[in-house]
């Protein structure tokens, strides 16, 4: 027997064994019991199924991934730019041709909780790895709400993935390696409020999808849960209760206000994807659910990360400046650019003019020596709408060169974080693509 034939036979045997193992796993895998009330579901005061579905769809932030910028809600087209290509959020309106109008209850539940739709496996850009913990009743309430909305006929864009990532069947093996299909189970050592917060954070809110580092296989690294990750060029901060590098030094009021409005006095203002999460989802939580989420985040395992990013609440550059007169750093390109385009809103002492959202002192973004979110804000701008209040920072991506973006980002990190900025023109060029 030739070596080539021998290798071919071994390959066939390996494929058969792996396929058989996966088939056996799908039959025998433990999925856990259905979550029981009152942990699961919308607040008890919302009894109408459509109202429950609307609340849950907002808590799950469905609109963010299934709506293109400037597009119709839930009609799809949002682009996820990943290292291996681009994936587009799909149309989840009730249109029977281009949406999910022809899906049965079981098909919808399976897609949301197992990542398998009528046309095959979904990619984990759809956070079924978190939604798997949802109760069936909650998933079907979301479906009922989506089906109550006007159907929108809009074809889904073709994904732009390179081989082998464009082979959906390969997701079966990814799931085998990285997907733990299990319903939410309350922690009996914690009270009802904490467990409610856990359900909101881990299942509905899928916080770990953005705030937890990924491994080489793009699976979530649970050993570093919520300790921070880069998402679409923005740095999703450490939200564990570590006092130096997480949110452990925040007061409960600061955290509650940040979740409800996107701004915490003396701390951060939400930008980028986090601003979208607050705008589309978190601001609509009931006060009780807001407090449950706060309690959960304040009472999980703290994880210390890079101490170089520890927030400085009294940076010398800001404290030595007034609102209109700069102190601190010497003249530089970054300082001149800040003077011309930034100081009018942010002010030299970083307190912000007219809007609290323009404050910079205490921000996790300006305390990151790599300046990732600062660069994104300069390149892309950022916006947030809370109720009738609309806040906007314009983008400067077309106006500034890569060198200029790096210069002003490093100035901001130095002036308002008292850190040595490490942003380079090469980094900026890479972030422009994201």
Language-model features: locations:
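N-terminal type II signal-anchor transmembrane helix
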Residues: 2-36
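Flexible coil segments in periplasmic/lumen-exposed cytochrome c-class electron-transfer proteins
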Residues: 29-40, 67-86, 118-198, 202-203, ...
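Short extracytoplasmic
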Residues: 42-74, 79
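Short cysteine clusters
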Residues: 62-65, 207-210, 342-345
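Acidic/histidine-rich, surface-exposed loop or edge segments in extracytoplasmic proteins
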Residues: 86-94, 234-240
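Aromatic- and charge-enriched surface segment that lines or borders ligand/interaction sites
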Residues: 100-115, 119, 248-251, 255
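Extended, polar beta-sheet/loop recognition surfaces of beta-rich domains
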Residues: 259, 361-404
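C-terminal structural cap/anchor segments
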Residues: 330-371, 376
């Amino acid at each position: 027997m030739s070596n080539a034939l021998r290798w071919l036979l071994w390959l066939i045997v390996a494929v058969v064994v792996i396929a058989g193992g996966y088939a056996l796993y799908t039959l025998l895998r433990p999925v856990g019991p259905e979550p029981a009330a009152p942990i699961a579901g919308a607040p008890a005061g919302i009894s109408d199924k459509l109202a429950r579905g609307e609340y849950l769809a907002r808590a799950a932030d469905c609109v963010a991934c299934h709506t293109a910028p400037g597009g119709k809600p839930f009609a799809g087209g949002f682009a996820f730019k990943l290292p291996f290509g681009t994936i587009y959020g799909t149309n989840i309106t009730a249109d029977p041709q281009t949406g999910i109008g022809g899906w049965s209850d079981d098909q919808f539940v399976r897609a949301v909780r197992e990542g398998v739709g009528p046309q095959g496996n979904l990619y984990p850009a759809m956070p079924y790895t978190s939604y798997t913990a949802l109760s069936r009743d909650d998933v079907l309430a979301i479906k009922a709400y989506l089906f109550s909305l006007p159907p929108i006929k809009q074809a889904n864009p073709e994904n732009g993935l390179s081989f082998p990532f464009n082979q959906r069947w390969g997701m079966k093996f990814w799931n085998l390696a990285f997907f733990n299909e299990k319903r939410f189970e309350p922690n009996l050592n914690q009270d009802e409020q904490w467990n409610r917060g856990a359900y909101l954070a881990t299942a509905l809110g899928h916080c770990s999808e953005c705030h937890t580092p990924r491994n080489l296989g793009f699976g979530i690294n649970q050993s570093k849960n919520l300790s921070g990750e880069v998402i679409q060029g923005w740095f999703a901060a450490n939200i564990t209760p570590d006092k130096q590098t997480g949110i452990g030094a925040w007061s409960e009021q600061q955290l509650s206000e940040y979740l409800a409005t996107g701004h915490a006095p003396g701390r951060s203002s939400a930008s980028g994807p986090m601003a979208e999460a607050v705008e589309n989802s978190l601001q609509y939580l009931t006060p009780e659910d807001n407090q449950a989420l706060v309690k959960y985040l304040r009472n999980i395992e703290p994880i210390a990360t890079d101490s170089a990013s520890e927030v400085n609440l009294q940076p010398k550059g800001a404290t030595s400046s007034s609102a209109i007169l700069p102190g601190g750093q010497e003249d530089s390109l970054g300082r001149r650019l800040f003077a011309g385009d930034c100081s009018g809103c942010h002010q030299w002492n970083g307190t912000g003019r007219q809007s609290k959202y323009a404050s910079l002192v205490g921000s996790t973004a300006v305390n990151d020596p790599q300046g990732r979110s600062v660069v994104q804000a300069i390149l892309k701008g950022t916006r947030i709408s809370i109720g009738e209040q609309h806040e906007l920072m314009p983008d400067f991506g077309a106006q500034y060169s890569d060198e200029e973006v790096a210069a002003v980002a490093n100035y901001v990190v130095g002036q308002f974080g008292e850190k040595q900025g490490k942003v380079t023109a090469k980094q900026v060029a890479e972030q422009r693509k994201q």
